[in-house]
Amino acid sequence: MVILFQLALLLLVVMSFVLIVGVPVLYATNGDRVQSNRLILVGGLAWTALVVLVGVLNYFVV
């Protein structure tokens, strides 16, 4: 269970860095706005799910 918690936490940190860099880049590009907004929404939802998962796993680990 500890390894699963550590992997989820690592994934959360990596996803946070990707979103910190990716969101401004996607907003600054002149590409397809609908696809960019969808990508940002999916990234935000995945990040939120990871926060909840880390919280639940933290309850079981500690």
Curated annotation (Swiss-Prot):
Gene Ontology CC terms: photosystem II reaction center; plasma membrane-derived thylakoid membrane
Coiled coil start-end: none
Compartments, record wording: Cellular thylakoid membrane
Membrane topology field: Multi-pass membrane protein
NCBIfam families found in the cross-reference section: PS_II_psbZ
Keywords carried by this UniProt record: Membrane, Photosynthesis, Photosystem II, Reaction center, Thylakoid, Transmembrane, Transmembrane helix
Regions that span the bilayer: 8-28, 41-61
Family: Belongs to the PsbZ family.
GO biological process, one term: photosynthesis
The protein, known as: Photosystem II reaction center protein Z
Disulfide bonds: none
Predominant localisation class: membrane
Annotated function: May control the interaction of photosystem II (PSII) cores with the light-harvesting antenna, regulates electron flow through the 2 photosystem reaction centers. PSII is a light-driven water plastoquinone oxidoreductase, using light energy to abstract electrons from H(2)O, generating a proton gradient subsequently used for ATP formation.
Domain of life the protein comes from: Bacteria
Gene: psbZ
InterPro entries: PSII_PsbZ (IPR002644), PSII_PsbZ_sf (IPR036512)
The species this protein was found in: Synechococcus elongatus (strain ATCC 33912 / PCC 7942 / FACHB-805) (Anacystis nidulans R2)
The protein's assembly and partners: PSII is composed of 1 copy each of membrane proteins PsbA, PsbB, PsbC, PsbD, PsbE, PsbF, PsbH, PsbI, PsbJ, PsbK, PsbL, PsbM, PsbT, PsbX, PsbY, PsbZ, Psb30/Ycf12, peripheral proteins PsbO, CyanoQ (PsbQ), PsbU, PsbV and a large number of cofactors. It forms dimeric complexes.
